[in-house]
Amino acid sequence: MNLDSLTAYRLVKKEKLNDIRSTGYLFRHIKTGARVMAIENDDENKVFNIAFRTPPKNSTGVAHILEHSVLCGSKDFPLKDPFVELVKGSLNTFLNAMTYPDKTCYPVASCNDQDFQNLMHVYLDAVFYPNIYKKEEIFRQEGWNYHLENTEGPLTYNGVVYNEMKGAFSSPDDVLERDIMNSLFPDVTYGCESGGDPENIPDLSYEEFLDFHRTYYHPSNSFIYLYGNMDMTEKLDFIDKKYLSAFDSLHVDSEIQEQKPFDKMHDLVMEYPVAESESEENNSYLAYSVVTGNAMNSLECTAFDVLDYALLGAPGAPLKKALLDAEIGSDVYGSYEDGIRQTYFDVIAKGADPSRKEEFVSIIRRVLTEIVQNGIDPKALEAGINCMEFRYREADFSSYPKGLIYGLDILDNWLYDDEHPFAQVQLIPVFDKLKELKNQRYFEGLIQKYLLDNTHGSILTLNPSRGLTARRAKALEEKLAAHLASLNDEEKAEMVQKTVELERYQETPEDPETAKCIPMLKREDIRKEITPFTNEALDIDGSLFLYHEVPTNGIGYLDLMFDVKDLPAEKVPYLGLLKSVLGYVDTAHYTYGELTNEINAETGGIMCGVEVFDHAESIDEFRAFFSVRGKTMYPKTDVLFKMIREILNTSSLEDTRRLHEIISQVKSRAQSSLVSAGHSTAVLRAASYTSPMAAFQDAMAGIAYYQFIETLDREFEERKETLVAELTELMRELLRPEYLCISYTGEKESLSDVRKQVKALRQTLHQEAVEISEQSITCEKKNEAFTTSGQVQYVAQTGNFRKKGFAYSGALNILKVALSYDYLWTNIRVKGGAYGCMSGFKRSGESFFVSYRDPHLKRTLDVFKGIPEYVRNFNADEREMTKYIIGTISGKDVPRTPKMQGAISKNAWFCGVTEEMAQKERDEILNADSTSMQALAPLIEAVLLNNAICVVGSEPAVNKEKELFDNVLPLING
């Protein structure tokens, strides 16, 4: 970097960042005081982020609504939705915006330099010169609005953020998290809901919304971040000349204030909604929470991550075990929040009896006191430190750019501390220090200081309340009816007119000439060839050994896969349970707690799961495997295999009390995930009506599996002997050498050792004769709705075009982008107010359309019905078509971590996708035009013809449209 030419900036700090092989620079913009960080390295996946401190003073969600709104057009890019245009037409590897409790971030990433420049330009223009001052409709669309179609009513609220937060406030886990933070920080910004409380969002006025932007969206309050291999001097010069230099320095009062400590712990009782089908008995949350210092102390923050693991995170961890043994809750877990100025630590019991609150607190304090007196298990500390350090060094964030995660982590310090801005990417010395301190009672001292002797905390009881959603809905309905009744005829007419004007604004198509202001790449900028797969098929005594030679920085990624093709249908749910049991029960040489610590102290972890692959060319054909995945540094390969053998060959299933604990935890977590990922739940269930693979997955991980687990938990005493027999038999039937395939990703130097270990492992697997009664999975179309206590819907419709005689085409990838960011986006998100909408098309023909946190139900299904007409009339000029093609390719050309390279190649192998097929798909994408898109209309009609629908949603919305369904059932029972 040519520092001499950067006359607009003052260099504050330059440091070698050895942990991430980079050089870090910290600047201050001289004219405005903007904070600027540049991290130089050879990473081609370049990242830009601009963040602002945005502490809310209430729970109207102004920071969140503003985050949505500034991306709805700006001075240089006066479109209605430049964000969507970028998604459709850039090679971005990340493009989004996020609201946190005290900051708002606008990050982008791309490997293409021109594309990166374009993204940075649009985002800078959006935050500094948004169209929100010219178009009140933006605020009304993204935040909230009165919706009144005629003067007689009814009057309702709508808005993207309003509906998003209605969904968020429907999740008890989210409600608990908010209530805990509010209980610990009642007098500062963390006592407010930055995302917005649906009850308070309509209190926000347009002028208050604009004032928030005027106050906080100024360079003097900004934190600008650049990362990767780029001309930093050029980028910083652009940022100065185009934006920062136009502003003067301004004192922005955005400092995050600290909550004064409490004299004694606060004791609070709150409530959350449950459906009528759900029990109020033993369904409370108990939370013991304490403030644990501040985010600027990297040593303490990292130490608390380790303590979270050692006390609560690991199976068999002492605090977790004590609470489970006392049957305080069906699930016990902890969390450590260090993404805000004042950090805090929680101990949470879910599925608890509120009358046992005192006992809950007493056990926590007794166990912690004993731990302080007797010392923490050294192996647990070693495992916790190694676990955190392995993850930090590996830096595998899947499809998310490394620089993005580094930048967001850096803000955890930088936002509050200009002195140590790079602390989050300089943690190796911290891990080394913790290894020194683990035998010096440092961790015990933290427990005593923060968890026992600390009065700045809260004890929160969150109780279930049947009918709470209905009472709130009735109160809102009455409030809006009263408001409508208070208006005179002129005011009502004006409200109807504003509704019409907003709809007109939303329905007005983007001017093609205006759209050209968004800079765009050319088709020639796109690589023509696919990234080759890395599959080398080897053989070990008859077992397929799929080797992926990839530079992995000394880490080996192992996947032992046992084919379950002959598994009878009635055993599939037990397969789903087995993945949660193995590795979490006692073995011949370890208790389950010792087993976890041994694995995490010596390796990067071992995890069991089930992998499913649908065949690319054969309809309804799929392969499924019970998998044991592990990762380790090459020198510890023998330890990894030793621990895998311990799990597969010596796991004890006789401890039925432990099995019941696991089942209760699986049930508890499924209750949360089925609702929070309601779109995935609904899609899988709808697909299971006609797809054997989806029916298999539903029985092993979806609604059918939850129903199996719920029954097993309720009738455990009667079923426990059968359960032990079924799991034991399943292991004998599955864990056999003839069913074993291996996928391994690593460098050549590690291969011979892994092959030797696999060869030895095969000899230890079950080889006795077994009889398996094969029974294929049957599908049954049901068209179901599953009711929840929530206030929004997840509406899914599925089908299979291959079964109707249509072939797969690469153009379907483009259609997915066009639907998600044009037709569905406009009709379901913009006009309908849903938070999200998605579609998908697989080579097997399986296809879906789904909405996310949607206030509607039947209206959304009607939107789906209109898709064929949209496709039939699809008419994009060359520029628009190129945009869609670029946006489609960006989703396929995401930079791959070493682990991803192996996984993608493995998936292609088992799905029967060759490089020739992948290249054909890419060619079809690159050569697509409007005609090839229009040709997909009959295919989409065939998908919708199946009329397979599933909805996860609120009781009132479902009951209003119950004639659409064959079955209406509660999602959660008991």
Across the structure, where does each feature detected by a protein language model lie?
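Extended, regular secondary-structure scaffolds
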Residues: 211, 223, 232-251, 374, ...
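Non-catalytic, conformational "gating/processing" segments within enzyme and secreted inhibitor domains
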Residues: 158, 210-242, 723-758, 945
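Non-catalytic terminal extensions that flank enzyme cores
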Residues: 1-47
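Active-site His/Glu-centered metal-binding helix of metallohydrolases
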Residues: 62, 66-70, 578
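His/Glu-based metal-binding/catalytic segments typifying zinc-dependent metallopeptidases
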Residues: 40-42, 49-51, 162, 166-170, ...
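Generic recognition of flexible, low-complexity loop/linker segments
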Residues: 94, 210-214, 273-276, 319, ...
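Hydrophobic, small-residue-rich alpha-helical packing segments that form membrane-like cores
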Residues: 150-221, 225-243, 247-275, 280-282
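M16 family metallopeptidases and their MPP-like homologs
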Residues: 45-55, 81-129, 136-147, 174-199, ...
